[in-house]
Amino acid sequence: MKSSAAIEKYNMTNVKEKNGELAWKLLGHMEKMTQERFGAMWLENAERNLGFLNKGHSLSELRNARLKIADHAVVIAAGPSLKRKNPAAAILKNNYNGTIIASESAMSYCLRNGLVPDLVVTLDPHATRVVRWFGDPLLDEQKLAADDYFARQDQDDAFADEIRANQEILTMLNEHGSKIKIALSTSTSIAVVDRVLETGMEIFWWNPMLDDPDLPGSITAKLQDMNGLPCVNAGGNVGTASWMMADAVLGMKHIALTGVDFSYYEGTPYLNTQYYKEAIALVGEANLDSLYVRFENPHVGASFFTDPAYLWYREVFLDMVEDSDAKTYNCTEGGILFGEGIESISFQAFLNRFGG
């Protein structure tokens, strides 16, 4: 999240909203805020990556491909439910024979649990953080001291010792990278591109759809003019992008979501939420309750809370699923992604229906 001209009136001295009311008011501004935050970086990275396009394929070559014979797939994202529900164990126990699509942030979880995903998806253009999911060859204590992003997250306990975890990821991906296809966004940082090439992952390039390409000054149109690659509506986040790869690119008919929480478990300190520092910058610590929304999930009988970014991702996903020809099953068993067009069932129920 980043303050834009449209929301500058909100600051730590005059916030009157409570109980997440401000988050709902910000929904209409989130697309512009995202463009302000990442737009220049997306274009800079895409221009630099022109020199690497010949190291991979266009995403169009993956379209309607069957990575596995089955017409169903499981998406594994890295929401806080991942370490609680452990979908990899269920996949292996049930000898699931469908396609496994993992966000880059869930890739190390998969490999650590003996599961090699068929396709990995990456989107975020951040210069230094995203490469951590691939193993950062340059990570040291100085880098860790400069950015506590990973240390603050409610994530896989394996990341508690960050240096050791990084070395483990380096080793695992060096071993398994050549077996994995990756849908690599042109917005990706040079650190990620270098690491992907080093590991031998098979690259399929794509452009994220960042705005309406028919509008004047469209970033999406600039990307497409620059490289001619397919554009995919990623919904603002890698979890939704992974679902779109299953739906619009691979043409799957049944898609299970795991680790797609778009939220946090009750009791999680605000400090451990992904956009905590951005929230502090926007409204100040005393007004954080104005930005965090509570949801009761009727399918699991528990409540969860979310921030403006993940609230936006949720609303965008619910719009996108209406246009999908696939049947989407949320098997996260928690979180806030539920509504029309999504069947909320346990992951075991999905595996019983579509397992090996």
Where are these regions (language model features)?
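N-terminal donor/sugar-recognition subdomains of glycan-related enzymes
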Residues: M1-N97, S108-V121, T128-W205, L229, ...
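General structural concept
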Residues: G98-E104
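Contiguous, well-ordered alpha-helical segments that form the cores/surfaces of helical PPI scaffolds
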Residues: E104-R112, T240-M245
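Glycine-rich phosphate/pyrophosphate-binding loops
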Residues: A106-M107, N113-A127, V249-L271
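Beta-sheet-dominated scaffold domains
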Residues: D194-V196, V238-S242, A279-A281
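Active-site gating loop/helix substructures
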Residues: G200-A234, E285-A302
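ATP/pyrophosphate-binding catalytic subdomain of soluble kinases
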Residues: I219-V260, Y264
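Active-site phosphate/oxyanion-binding loops
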Residues: S263, G267-G301
